[in-house]
């Protein structure tokens, strides 16, 4: 899974330009990331999200979304959605967000708490607002922070979660 993160990040940063670049990257350079060939993974979508234009999906954990009005303050960014399947039982969702302009040169990997199986969109939005590129994952399952029922009978999902 680390290779998937690395491949998406390197490709995105190469198309986005140099450290601290103030010139916006082309929306085409973002959507072009949909053509990336990744081992055991597929880019589901790559889209240029306009400033204030992101709406988070419904959530099992309200803390991963926060106040929906917050997203109106998030600047434009490139959103890459990946599905990784290193095993037949794997279903890992990954998102990588890269600022459209003003990249700080920093990358922030966004984690989850407990057994949480959701992408922390609130923290990713805050990272992009600071000019950081960021990535998050659901660690291969969809569940609340105290629900581990997804692991019963699914040793590969446990491996995905622990990786």
Where in this protein do the model-derived segments appear?
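Cap/lid segment of the alpha/beta-hydrolase catalytic domain
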Residues: 104, 112-163
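Bacterial N-terminal signal peptides
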Residues: 6-16
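Catalytic-loop region of hydrolases
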Residues: 19-110, 119-122
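Positively charged n-region of N-terminal signal peptides that target proteins for export
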Residues: 1-4
